[in-house]
Amino acid sequence: MFSLLGHAVNYGSHRTRRSFSRIKEVLKLPNLTDVQTQSYKWFLNEGIREMFDDIMPISDFSGKLSLEFVDYKLLKPKYTLEEARDHDANYSAPLHVTLKLTNHETGEIKTQDVFFGEFPLMTDSGTFVINGAERIIVSQLVRSPGVYYHSDFDKNGRQIFGATVIPNRGAWLEYETDAKDLAYVRIDRTRKLPLTVLIRALGFGSDSEVADMFGESDSLRFTLEKDIHKNPADSRVAEALKDIYERLRPGEPKTTDSSRSLLYARFFDPRRYDLAPVGRYKINKKLSLKNRLLRQTLAETLADPDTGEIIAKKGDVVTHEILDKLSPYLDRDDFKMVTYEPSKEGVLPDPVTVQEIKVYSKVDPERVIKLMSNGHIADDVKHLTPADVLASINYFFNLQDNIGTTDDIDHLGNRRIRRVGELLQNQFRIGLARMERVVRERMSIQDISTVTPQQLINIRPVVASVKEFFGSSQLSQFMDQNNPLGELTHKRRMSALGPGGLSRDRAGYEVRDVHYTHYGRLCPIETPEGPNIGLINSLATYAIVNKYGFIETPYRRVSWDTHKVTDKIDYLTADVEDNYIIAGANAPLNEDGSFKDKIVLARHKEDNLEVTPDKIDYMDVIPKQVVSVTSACIPFLENDDSNRALMGANHQRQAVPLINPHAPIVGTGMEYRAAHDSGDALVAKAPGVVEYVDANEIRIRRDDDTLDKYVLEKFRRSNATKNYNQTPAVKQGERVVADEVIADGPAMENGELALGQNPIIAFLTWNMYNYEDAVMISERMVKDDVYTSIHIEDYESEARDTKLGPEEITREIPNVGEDALKDLDEEGIVRIGAEVQDGDILVGKVTPKGVTELSAEERLLHAIFGEKAREVRDTSLRVPHGGGGIVQNVQVFTREAGDELPPGVNKMVRVYIVQKRKIQVGDKMSGRHGNKGTIALVCPEEDMPYLPDGRPVDICLNPMGVPSRMNIGQVLELHLGIAAKQLGIHVATPVFDGASEDDMWNMVREAGIGKDGKTVLYDGRTGEPFHNRVSVGIMYYLKLTHMVDDKIHARSIGPYSLVTQQPLGGKAQFGGQRFGEMEVWALEAYGAAYTLQEILTYKSDDVVGRVKAYEAIVKGERIPKPGVPESFRVLVKELQSLGLDIKVLDMDHKEIELRDMDDDSNDHFNIDTLSKLAEQQEKKKLAEEAAKKDDKSAEPVDQSDSSTSSDDKVSK
């Protein structure tokens, strides 16, 4: 019966899985981090040179000096990777550039090596170490440079057209028509001009010349009629140039020369305008005649220019066959080429050569129109040419005759990837351009005879731009280092945000939506929930990025004559794929590669078709090429609703590495490659035999008898404060092959990804403890450390120089008992291995206080002992709330030891504290199908429901969580898991090609489990069986990084905001819980006036009141009445700042003087005694008047009222 279990597949040398896949793997997965590493390699080998060649040579304004680039080299890094991490430094290498300075007057040449700053290096796994932390440069998905056409309908239902020429760097050029069919142009987003103005500015002044060039077009005719010039052609060209200058530089004096040079600089100057190789490729492709000729009726006969043989006659409709015959001729430089001579007044005086073919209009079959291409412009011409402009305008007019196609902006043929190499190059170019200006200025200032390249170069702008990019760019991100899968996904992430991209506020629904071109290129499932949904995507498993930045996906070629599927692989971009019909990978094949079925399900563009095998051009390589690595790790993905699959993919990245992880019993076969390529596993460089193994190192004797030594990472803190630890996966004497995993990283077992555990799970409601997705777990999970994880946090203390003297790290701390110092060494630093709790001292530190006026006693002491009592305050580093644990490591950095420290810092101490966190109530857990929940109860093992053989289940999940969520994959995984466990095997069920329902039931039957997959379950408390049979099985379950220890928080006495004097918010600030508007309504509704009053005063921002209340509580007295909240004063001050005269009135509309409004001490103002205060002031006035009238000394007024009693002297 073992034949039911699929076929055995080895993943590494330590794991065999039974795979249910039926489709043979014809293509190996590419390396999953290549998208990062290959791009950076290109940058180091070619990108840097390309950039220097673009910027140099730099000449001075007189042309006497020129600075040229010769070569560059990267030297050895200053720090190793480990040293860079420890010292909070960058892992970078010095860049040295050889420059040649030529003096053209004397012919003297000076060559010199110039240091160009430290350049960050990429690690082997595709990350950068910046300031000691690992960072990743996320690839960016942007609109490709090129020319794009679109159409729309105006309010009257008329079709209007538009076109945009988008460069990589430079001004945009836009064409548009309006409701009257007039054609306009916008240059660099300015106000529109008639399109004919641009054509005239290129040097084609007369109307007949323009009409002749573009053929008959209504839109052109109407525009010419509107743009009437009575002047001769040449002066019209000058007028057009001035019109454009007026638009671009309004208000400035215009001359023909300045207008000409401005337009030239905007579009035709290679230094100012850059299409990049990809823009040139896209423009040549779009404007080529091949794309427009198909199905057009020719208005002229086409013949071979050499032999005169007729290829197609006038009146012929161009079919695929005719187009195939024409194609080689269209690529020639002597076929249907037409040259136009522009006026000398135009932007560029050179003749313009284009390729033209005449056809009949589809709208009016009598009318002849021209199809024009830009000729054959070389791939290295990265600026626009007049031929590009004319051909793009011609295409624009052709669209109005139903010739040509509009473009879909969200099509992946029009969106490209900017990878790390290109992003770095762009940033470096910005720095070099700034440096170029400095060099030019210095050339004109310095003495020509003595100047050297070193004196001309200022590397500060270059260093600053690179530093800014790595430090603060939106695309330079702190690496997600929760687990290897999170790391790998981060490296393969594609973001549409960032400089030059979209912003999440302006991104509409269309940009975020799944597009048919995502198939095999971007994962349709994995994307964040929330405001970034659809803007951040993940590269599909088999996708690669080509040299132009377009994503390609592999397909198996179908032979065009035999119609059999071959093993030849073609990588296709999205726009090339649009030309073919492609069958799915699940289409059944015969042994010889022919299709079994007469009708095959296939795709063409966005349509799903049923076609005969002879129509098919390509076939998918494997079903999982559609999804990303994380989605490909979800078994039975095809049985989950996509929203839940999205959550499942995201939850896997949040799994915490456990102490003793296990790979899933039900896997997908993706686990080995994900772990291998993540960069966290240690991999053998060459084949050999393991000679020595311990926890810290592995030694392998190669076949050529050389010895390789591999050092393992031990208990390092990861970016996500998790424990990064490697453990050997091989034994002494074992033979290894090259590229095999020899040591597991975090969350790995036997070279496979192991994000969680395989507990026994029952779908059972239990005393309402799993209400609303809550999870009930067995105490065994806690006792046996099944879900225990290790967390490492680091804390730093710096001793700085202050104005009053240097801070000191010491054991002698004022007003601290000996018991608080028990774990500190003689220097005042905590010992390794000490167990510390919240508030314990880690590093003793004192800071000088300002010298105060000495008291008589201190003066006496000073006179006797001759030294001033040291005035210092305790600024020791203490364990923050929830940070207790065991001190794992202490690092001390001092200048004496040769460590680089920031200015003003004399000594720095870093303490690592390790916590062992067991699973507990409040922790979040999840499966791989988006079935998440928090733990509501840790139930004693003896009370858990148990199986007929006495085994208690480990976890109880609510069965109500399955039907409405439609993630049935978890139920299938549950049954298959228990069957595999009973049979003692691991299984692989790849996505879209895994175990069918029949396979699963066959395996369940073979394992001897009931045919419904359910079992009788007994109540652990009573021993009675539950009424119904219950689904019990094994499902992979993860502990997520959202742990209650990091979230739980209660404020006692804490900090207040400076302006409003209200408590801060959030755990990090030790803040309070906001009692918001709706909570106030609730208390108002209950009529709880006193509770409400104290919440709005003492507990919030009544500064005096809270102090008095505190004093009263300490002394055991009655709590005084509250006073004025600080926010009321802030409101008054803000209104006063607007120039409003604010008066506070009592209930009788009498004014109260808020003298304390200006008084910093914020004292005697009581909102409850407003009328009382008014009375006091009235009495005072009367008393003063009486005193004036009476010559005798006035009778003393009773003062007891005006100096309010301590009860009244409160705050709000």
Curated annotation (Swiss-Prot):
Keyword Metal-binding: no
Keywords, alphabetical: DNA-directed RNA polymerase, Nucleotidyltransferase, Transcription, Transferase
Function: DNA-dependent RNA polymerase catalyzes the transcription of DNA into RNA using the four ribonucleoside triphosphates as substrates.
Family in the record: Belongs to the RNA polymerase beta chain family.
Subunit annotation: The RNAP catalytic core consists of 2 alpha, 1 beta, 1 beta' and 1 omega subunit. When a sigma factor is associated with the core the holoenzyme is formed, which can initiate transcription.
Basic and acidic residues compositional bias, start-end: 1176-1195
A cellular component term, taken from the record's GO annotations: DNA-directed RNA polymerase complex
Stated name of the protein: DNA-directed RNA polymerase subunit beta
InterPro entries, sorted: DNA-dir_RNA_pol_bsu_ext_1_sf, DNA-dir_RNA_pol_bsu_external_1, DNA-dir_RNA_pol_su2, DNA-dir_RNAP_su2_dom, DNA-dir_RNAP_su2_hyb_sf, RNA_pol_bsu_bac, RNA_pol_bsu_CS, RNA_pol_bsu_protrusion
Annotated segments matching region Disordered: 1176-1212
GO molecular function per UniProt: DNA binding; DNA-directed RNA polymerase activity; ribonucleoside binding
Transcription is among the record's keywords: yes
Source organism of this protein record: Lactobacillus gasseri (strain ATCC 33323 / DSM 20243 / BCRC 14619 / CIP 102991 / JCM 1131 / KCTC 3163 / NCIMB 11718 / NCTC 13722 / AM63)
